[in-house]
Amino acid sequence: MYKIFYEQRALIFPNIEEKELDLDVTSTQLESYEVEKIHNFLRQWLVVNLTEDVTIDGLSPEVLSAALVRTFRLAPAAGGVVLADGQFAAIERHGIPDLPKGHIEEGEDAATAALREVEEETGLTGLTIIRQLPTSWHCYLYEDEWRLKPTYWFLMNTSDPDHTNPQTDEDITEVTFLSEYDLEWFLKNTYRSIADTLGEELKTEN
């Protein structure tokens, strides 16, 4: 199952897995009637005032891939779930509990970007990656352009959880480690793309 999130709603493709998508498509693949139809639907879904999820079944990965490329500019990012003493690191940005993440720079792989962004946003050092987690996908409007952000998540450890330094120039006001008792609150108040994608992983690790 593949999901794209926009604000607190989701577009769900139950018969497609993320690994089936190929977002490196040629211009000729963008011109079919099916691709045009899904592209138009995506544009309508982004602007219509809906609160419920929408499910689209029976679509091929090839058509969806081409429609996504036609509709969005890709903005890949990477981030981390940092563990220490049975807790995980969360940040507060714009008053919303979140996880540290940021854009992948040119020439970086996702793992390197995740380590860099987590250290920059939290001040945590001594970071090591344990394993990769599921990828979240959400879209947003930036300077009149719709963007689709796949965020590649990694489970991490830190050897020094006692020293944090929130990146205030990125509007991060707090870095804190949350326990299993805080998890329900976090999942209820964070972005749905994080709660749906990483919720079970966080429950397992805490």
Task: Identify what each model region corresponds to.
Residues 56, 80, 154-158:
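Short beta-strand element of the conserved SAM-dependent methyltransferase core
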Residues 1-47:
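N-terminal leader/capping segments at the start of a protein or of a new domain
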Residues 21-23, 28-31, 83-119, 124:
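Conserved Nudix-box catalytic region and its N-terminal flanking loop in Nudix hydrolases
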Residues 35-79:
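Acidic, metal-coordinating catalytic segment for phosphate/diphosphate chemistry
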Residues 79, 87, 174:
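Conserved beta-strand and immediately adjacent loop positions that scaffold enzyme active sites
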Residues 1, 77, 149-153:
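Short hydrophobic/aromatic beta-strand or adjacent loop that forms the aromatic wall/cage
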